[in-house]
């Protein structure tokens, strides 16, 4: 991985260009051709550094319920249990962790019609957990991380719609977010189809958005307008790349738990 690869990885973790030819735009920013950008990203995906490029949506704004789950297993059962839990489509960030009686931690999201606690309890029983803790999200503070591949450091961020500015506008947005972050936003069936389509991994071809738009029965410009609308309604956090942090050179991963006054 050379400096051009690293610069590209930095760029695609920022809001990914939603333009007709995004790889051409990326190439202009780092001084290489569109095809070279595609070739480099293809290789980064082959070596498992680049996981995918897609829209990232806020599950809570879509009516999903989320929780952090901690489970305790006998050491010899841990790997098998983790593999079984990974089969659930609502599971993410599943890690074996040290420093606690609970040695497997993951996040779980379920659709509105499903019971969150019942789902976690079923998974616990099915995998033979000794004990479980379910910790539903009560308040949202910060989410997301960017890996600075050039300076080799990570930075967390809070998503913010592109339309939100600073000063009074930002203060108003902060207040609105604090009051409504966990409230579902109505979406139409057509919008649900678009959300599913935009979550698919972006093809590494010169005009990748055209095929998504065609599948949804709209023009590419209409797709871009819909993505902007999703961001303004805070349904979509961002459109960007997700990296495998260990393959990217970031070896450490820790979760910190504090008990603080309300």
Tell me what each language-model feature is.
Residues 1-262:
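A compositional/biophysical signature of low hydrophobicity enriched in polar/charged and small residues
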């Amino acid at each position: 991985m050379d400096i051009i690869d690293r610069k590209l990885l930095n760029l695609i973790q920022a809001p990914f260009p939603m333009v007709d030819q995004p790889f051409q735009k990326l190439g202009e920013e780092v001084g290489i051709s569109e095809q070279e950008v595609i070739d480099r990203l293809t290789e980064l995906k082959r070596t498992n550094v680049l996981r995918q490029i897609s829209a990232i949506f806020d599950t809570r704004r879509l009516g999903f319920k989320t929780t952090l789950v901690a489970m305790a297993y006998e050491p010899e059962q841990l790997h098998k249990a983790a593999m079984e839990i990974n089969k659930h489509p609502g599971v993410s960030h599943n890690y074996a962790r040290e420093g606690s009686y609970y040695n497997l931690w993951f996040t779980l999201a379920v659709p509105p019609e499903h019971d969150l606690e019942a789902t976690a309890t079923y998974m616990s029983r099915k995998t033979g957990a000794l004990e479980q803790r379910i910790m539903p999200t009560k308040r949202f503070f910060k989410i997301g991380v960017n890996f600075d591949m050039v300076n080799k450091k990570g930075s967390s961020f809070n998503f913010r719609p592109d339309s939100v500015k600073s000063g009074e506008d930002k203060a108003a947005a902060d207040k609105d977010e604090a009051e409504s972050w966990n409230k579902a936003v109505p979406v139409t069936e057509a919008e649900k189809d678009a959300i599913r389509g935009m979550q698919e991994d972006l093809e590494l071809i010169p005009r990748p958005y055209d095929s998504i738009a065609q599948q949804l029965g709209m023009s590419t410009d209409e797709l871009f307008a819909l993505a902007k609308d999703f961001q303004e309604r805070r349904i979509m956090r961002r459109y960007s790349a997700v990296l495998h942090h260990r393959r990217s050179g970031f070896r450490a991963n820790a979760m910190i738990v504090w008990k603080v006054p309300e």
